[in-house]
């Protein structure tokens, strides 16, 4: 079995590399003779990262986790909201370490190199530092920390010099490797906070310990005593320029240390660890250990010097609030290939996975041969991809892909009935047309009906999402546009804040399950600025491209087949009802994007269309002017589609939008632009007009003297002509001296000619239309736009 074949530690995958690491580690320690602390030269800069496991099936993934991950500590820290509580940063996993009393060194060594400190290299370096170097600074910091502790403050305990020296000598003995009589029956004595502080100075690298604040009972969960080990340990005995600023992250629970490592290529989250705890309705900074009083006043500065501190947004406790918290950036995997044990373990896992798959397939085939009527454990054949049936909550299987077991059985039943129904020759017996359907109603593709009873789910239960949904590759941002938070699969792809906001808005509607958002495509559920019969331009282009193949099979074109490999679509729950219908049976809500009533927007005067920045009016049914034009256009098309053929509802002679880098379709109603680009162009035109309005007025003022001066010049003698004479000696202008030959025979020079003054361009910049006096020099369109939005 794979459980027995997979090694229980990383170093067991390649013993040669493990030996090479153990040889290099002691050689890298530098021990000065002038009293300076012992320290590593280069090997303290390495960092381990775990490989991805989402490509394996859930059963084999569980085998990997059982071999390498300490599930008890991980679950304990996560349940206490100390680990992985922030969705904006990458998830950390706890690797197993030996519980022999040297777990602090095991965890630190494994975080950097992938091997445990079985040779006691780190423990010997710690002991030699405490014995052979100047430790007065360490002792002074330890005394300050002890005096501030709860034992001294609450009990009023006072130590004299002899007591302090005895306690310090005891701490040095605890770090020794020669401990035949260790406490608690362990091979080595457990270490304390001061040992972590000395260790981070030996490594010249910060250490962050994630731990609970209280020691709790394993049975009742009651508090025993406060825990002080959690917090930040900075290498304060070194200048920040000589330290490695990426911290080592350890977890501590039940008197045991484990390394907390990130997963390689795990998703879009930030590779960082929060420097705060979320507890009791507030964010509390992690404690920075062993600071002197002057250093405590400049704690923020020290953190930014020794760590790469960044700010990340997190959701506040109150609804709609956002907080910026500090987080320390984590290092990525940088082990050289000759000492990288993760790559070797991953190759071994891939090899064992192939063997495990072959054994599983062979076992299923033998079981099916013994009892053909019995299904061969369909749960073991589940894949991490949703069933292709619209709105089906189950996952597809290896044997029934691209459908789940339920939909596959229903399709087989329907196919068995089709030959009987379609036995008639001629048009009535076309495949894909169901007899007994209403006129013009085509055969509907298989869709999930939540009301249909099933005899027990052979697939994954809909109330328990697949572990794949929580894996590292599905970590995506919230579906709400502009929201910086990470989604929660339990909230239908939204973060907690946006989900609560949607719940509040949905409570005002009587039947929100049938409520369609005109700002969303009904096929791919994406937020769009313009829809065509309820679908976005991308899905519309796809349906028109598939029109020929759809007509050949007499099936209605499906709106949009979602990609099976797109993880963002896996976490989005489809609409409770299907919109894939055709003909007269199509509900108006699925074809139109304007099914809302003004009562749904009570308390606000914003436009009814989602994402529109303008305000609506009661005359336009709650829409702004532009959205109301689009609403009337789509409503007219919906009314006409009921009388036309199924293919008549498609738009003909569509043109792409004239906007730059815009892939949507344009509309003649918006001068060839889509609605979004039209609004942007009008806004730009309006701002340019507003910006240059003063310049235009000043130019008009300058033109006034010129016109008054020109009026003093002699005009044409003809009463109907207002032209200015080119020469003072003449009585008629050049136009009257040479009449237009195209004048009709009934016209003569004595008749007054119609006035046709020269036209003037619109005052708005970049406008090709002509202005008029009624609109103050603007064209009708720009003047109306200026009246509406100016």
From Swiss-Prot:
Stretches the record annotates as TRAF-binding: 58-300
Binding site for Zn(2+) 4: 607, 612, 624, 627
Alphabetically ordered keywords of this record: Acetylation, Apoptosis, Cytoplasm, DNA-binding, Hydrolase, Inflammatory response, Lysosome, Metal-binding, Multifunctional enzyme, Nucleus, Phosphoprotein, Protease, Repeat, Thiol protease, Transferase, Ubl conjugation pathway, Zinc, Zinc-finger
Record region (Interaction with ubiquitin): 157-159, 190-192, 224-227
InterPro entries in alphabetical order: OTU_Deubiquitinase (IPR051346), OTU_dom (IPR003323), Znf_A20 (IPR002653)
Residue positions, PTM Phosphoserine: 459, 575, 645
Residues annotated as catalytic: 100, 103, 256
Coiled coil: none
Region spans: Sufficient for inhibitory activity of TNF-induced NF-kappa-B activity: 606-790
Localisation per UniProt entry: Cytoplasm; Nucleus; Lysosome
Domain comment as written in the entry: The A20-type zinc fingers mediate the ubiquitin ligase activity. The A20-type zinc finger 4 selectively recognizes 'Lys-63'-linked polyubiquitin. The A20-type zinc finger 4-7 are sufficient to bind polyubiquitin. The OTU domain mediates the deubiquitinase activity.
Descriptive protein name: Tumor necrosis factor alpha-induced protein 3
